[in-house]
From Swiss-Prot:
GO terms for biological process: DNA-templated transcription. This is DNA-directed RNA polymerase subunit beta. It catalyses: RNA(n) + a ribonucleoside 5'-triphosphate = RNA(n+1) + diphosphate. It is an enzyme of class 2 (transferase). The RNAP catalytic core consists of 2 alpha, 1 beta, 1 beta' and 1 omega subunit. When a sigma factor is associated with the core the holoenzyme is formed, which can initiate transcription. GO terms for cellular component: DNA-directed RNA polymerase complex. InterPro entries: DNA-dir_RNA_pol_bsu_ext_1_sf (IPR042107), DNA-dir_RNA_pol_bsu_external_1 (IPR019462), DNA-dir_RNA_pol_su2 (IPR015712), DNA-dir_RNAP_su2_dom (IPR007120), DNA-dir_RNAP_su2_hyb_sf (IPR037033), RNA_pol_bsu_bac (IPR010243), RNA_pol_bsu_CS (IPR007121), RNA_pol_bsu_protrusion (IPR007644). GO terms for molecular function: DNA binding; DNA-directed RNA polymerase activity; ribonucleoside binding. Pfam families: RNA_pol_Rpb2_1, RNA_pol_Rpb2_2, RNA_pol_Rpb2_3, RNA_pol_Rpb2_45, RNA_pol_Rpb2_6, RNA_pol_Rpb2_7. It comes from Ehrlichia ruminantium (strain Welgevonden). The keyword Metal-binding does not apply. DNA-dependent RNA polymerase catalyzes the transcription of DNA into RNA using the four ribonucleoside triphosphates as substrates.
Amino acid sequence: MSSSVTSKYVLNSFSSVPRLSYAKSIDIKDSLTDLIKIQRDSYNAFIGIDQDVDSGIKNIFQSMFPIQDLLGRAVLQFVSYSIGEPQYDEYECIKRGITYSVPIRIVLRFIVWKVQEVSFKEVKYVVDEETSEKSIKYIKEQEVSIGDLPTMTSYGTFIINGVERVIVSQMHRSPGVFFDSDKGKTYSSGKLIYLARIIPYRGSWLDFEFDIKDILYFRIDRKRKLPVSLLLRALGLSNSEILDTFYDKIRYERCENGWVVPFVVDRFRGVRLSYDLVDIDGNVLVKANTRITLRLAKKLASDGLKKYLVPFAEIQGLFIANDLVDPASNVMIMCAGESITSEHINKLKLFDINEIFILNIDFLTVGPYILNTLFLDKNISYEDALFEIYKVLRSGESPSLDTMKAFFDGLFFEKERYDLSTVGRIKLNDHLGLDISEDVTVLTKDDIIHVIKKLVLLRDGEGFVDDIDHLGNRRVRSVGEFIENQFRIGILRLERMIMDYMSSVNFDNAMPCDFVNPKVLATVLKDFFSSSQLSQFMDQTNPLSEVTHKRRLSALGPGGLTRERAGFEVRDVHPTHYGRICPIETPEGQNIGLISSLAIYARINKHGFIESPYRKVDNGVVTDKVEYLLAMQESNYYIADASATLDENNRFVDDMLYCRHDGNFVMVKREQVDYIDVSPKQIVSVAASLIPFLENNDANRALMGSNMQRQAVPLLKADAPLVGTGMESIVAAGSGTVVLAKRSGIVHRVDGLYIVIRAFDKEKNEYLGVDIYNLRKFQRSNHNTCINQKPLVKPGDYVRENDVIADGSAIDQGELALGKNVLVAFMSWQGYNFEDSIVISSEVVKKDVFTSIHIEEFECVVRDTALGPEKIMRSIPDVNEDSLSHLDDVGIVNVGAEVSAGDILVGKVTPRPPVSLPPETKLLVTIFGEKVFDCVDSSLYLPIDVEGTVVDVHVFVRRGVEENDRSLLIKQNEINGFIKERDYEIDVVSEYFYDELKRVLVNTNTEYNNQNIEDYLKSIPQKSWWDIKLSDESVLSQISDLKEKFDSMIENAHSKFDQKIDKLNYGYDLPQGVLCIVKVFVAVKHNLQPGDKMAGRHGNKGVISRIVPVEDMPYLEDGTPVDIILNSLGVPSRMNVGQILETHLGWASVNLGKKIGNILDNIDELTIAHLRNFLDQVYDGQDLKYSIRSMSDDDLLAFAERLRDGVPMAAPVFEGPKDNQISNLLKLADLDVSGQVDLYDGRIGEKFDRKVTVGYIYMLKLHHLVDDKIHARSVGPYGLVTQQPLGGKSHFGGQRFGEMECWALQAYGAAYTLQEMLTVKSDDIVGRVKIYESIIKGDSNFECGIPESFNVMVKELRSLCLDVALKQDKDFLHDRKINN
């Protein structure tokens, strides 16, 4: 494919180095700017940012109101709604542990009518004589709060009770009609049983199905099945109307020789004649027993055959189309649908019937299914049909006709109880070829009739069943839709409450606010966000895991599938997933295929269907027009692969191309191609698009690679991959972890906590204001990883909108950096890398290459107890001074303190009941004046497995309770931060406006007070510049405008400051009985150690088996020791060859960097030309090549300096470099093209026999850390029933000595050890007390008792009425004495 447009590379200090990319296709990067668009758009559509457009909230209010009381005396109307601003910002909500929400207020109008008379039957209103309308007694209008709505953060998440959560989108079957078959599995004969199902968005399901006898039935909500004729009769159709609806009629006219029938070609196709085919003139055209082909039938028609004769007897067995009555005597000859017999033929002659209509049923193309079903239900009436349906759904009641009719209408035909939704109506219209308005979201009679018709056609062999796994039949429910459904439930509850209140309230005193209880809606929303299966604790391990979680699609959850019942078909990859759902990224366990990820370019349309983008092809030429297609639309077009070769005019080079069409691959001419893929990577998800050489890996390993990248822990120093895919910067920018510039401007000030930018539009030369960015420092994520943002810009830098100005965790220069580039050798080493184990160099640990920071949160709650309040204090009973060394005077640990297991973080005492002292203690107290503590130590201690540094302390004191010194200090620090922000903003605003004022004044070139104006300005304070009065009116007007803008911005800065101070002084609302909460955050440093899990990006995972001294590690010829040794046997069987290609490309990248570094170390004018030429060779065929040629020498040197550690490369998915391209890079770096080198044994210094594959791989440290898993116990808790130690680290349990371990001891004959394991070390209560006493006494003897598990077994046997008792055998004891 042709390369993209050349763009000059602009070097700046804060952007990443552009990658040497092997992409051949033109990327539509606009589609990748917002990776969490799926969440944001859905939520915005619900809340209706633009109130002119119908939104979810607006529609709900309009459907609920107006509400009138039961007698119609008053009405409550909806006028408008408004959404307020959040009380606290996102960070403050996390800190306070509250929900990030906005208040919703609605304006209600309460109208009370004037009435003359009120009775139970009717109300007589007073009518206005002028307008002839009901006369109004009074109107009251009021704005009412209906509760708070959790609102979405700028990152697409929700903060519920201080915790970030994500609402996962759900894949479910689209509303509409579906036709299917049982695939011959129901009956042993293998006969296909066809069925249809109408699924609404809300309401009862309606199923139609055939049985083995081809009788058609229907079910409502999967209840007992009934003949479909009952439903048709309940819809008001008679027998003849039903037959007219489902069958064509054939007119038979009687003549003396038989019946004259119109000749229709289709009726004779493939028919063997049972009689001679004779025209009306008596000519025999075709003899009996002749099979008529389509060709012969068409010839007869073309020869002029319009009508033919049927002998009288041949109508026997046909079905009459309508009731046949003798007009003279009014005698019923035949009923509609009845089969004609010889008796009926005689009656036709007797009553001289000259014309009859026959149902077109030939048993080949048209079957008698509806007719047979009609005869099954014994000709029941409309009322009986309604009763039969009512009886199945509401058994045990005897209803009236009106009740049954209202019930039946409510099932499918009333909006309140049944809703197909717009999507369902579109699908029904599309499926059945109807043209019913999209606003009609209930079923119609036509819908039901057309569904039955199509099902009958399927049984007759016409058409195909639906593929329920086709993405045209599955849609996505996103966050906005979920909240809308919950909102609707809350509003319906509120409506019922309003109706109840209206029936009992005095209207004269009532106001709109009296009718609304805001807690109703809040309760429903809280339940959904807190406990729904699709409202999930956000995976915040690293930026990629955040993005992936927000783009996840789940088939589970309410209204979805269950993992136990989901079959293989629904989990499998479907052809329509191409470009919509990633075929790679899915969990490995029982949820495989049920949880998936949105493809990288896919988007979800307003109806919830997934669209994929394609570039339009016009007569073999690829245009730049991008169109999004649905899965249903895509099957109609021929779509070429993105890797198709184009010439310089964007025309296909090949005459014939492989294309996708209707789920198959076909070869077509280039002129027939309709579309082409926008990119080869459009098939995969965000995580899979980050794996270089994905196409060289087995799919199972690619799946593991995608999933393990989400488990990578952010490291102490982030390092972007040398071999990437080009997606790293896009994922970083879309993750919300980095700080993006809101507006273009010039960086004014930067420190560790703030970036201050003077927003400025260069093109318009317009000042826009001040943007202050607060950086997040050492904050705890949901998964205890560290969130820490570092500024990239420096004062004076010009930044554009959406530039990355600060890195977050696992981000390096605006690129995703989940791991580290390390030197890897593929070889065996002393068996320590057996079974995927990893051998690592001590140098890696020493340099903190894979060290990560984790932040643990510990909470201490101070309560008001029945005996008095608990207190935070430094003087704690029975605790020595050394243990209090980390605490301040208040009793709270100092920030920066190094704490280890058992240290006190918060000193706290709890009152205890007074105890009566013995006389001797009272005497000592009296003599020595010793203080007797009436409280106990309840301090917050650091758990045993934690050691680290205190990085932050939060103190929340209940509003109205006196604050301690520490909380006052923390508050003062926050106020100082607000002051700093305000002063920064005022400084920037003042600097700009005074510069502008000076420019305006100086440009006048006048004198003021007998001085040059510029000199005069220097001599007076800046504030006095505004007071200068000039004679020029235009200059005064300019100064006035500047002053007005300046004052407005300064006032705005002070206003924001005052609001922040007010919120801070407001205090904290804590739970009942809680006086104070102290949260201590401890940063724990995790070094790499044996037992930690590591992985590459290709599914190559392993556990560290040994950390080898650096001097013992194999080393290169130049003495460089390798960092990691991997087992080469881990590659062939796993078929993830991508890791080897990455090794070679990484090896070339680093050595090219070394070569550039060597040139830079000896730089002069000649070598600059050599450097430019060398970079020209490295970036050959790249757009960047032209930028390098035109760079100044200084820019070139700065650019080359950033390539010292390696030349960053991009191997996009399905567009990675070929073998020859990697070989060329290795040659350019003066390396062996095999990618292998001689290695030397670090222990003995000898060269290994064979060359070894060595290179640089991007390795990740996963969050399965040995520190979190390793566990030991000596004394601990026991189970209540079994009296055995509990299991698991969380319960501080023991190690289970299981069945197989017992076998091992039995095999060795270690009887006493076995006895010890099964008794005193397990559940022998008496024995363990005795052994404890023996240990204290220093005695080595112990005695075993009866294990508690034996007693449990005995009791279980007794519960089965089996009395088991232990008896001592006297003879056995006697024999034992004699033997002794």
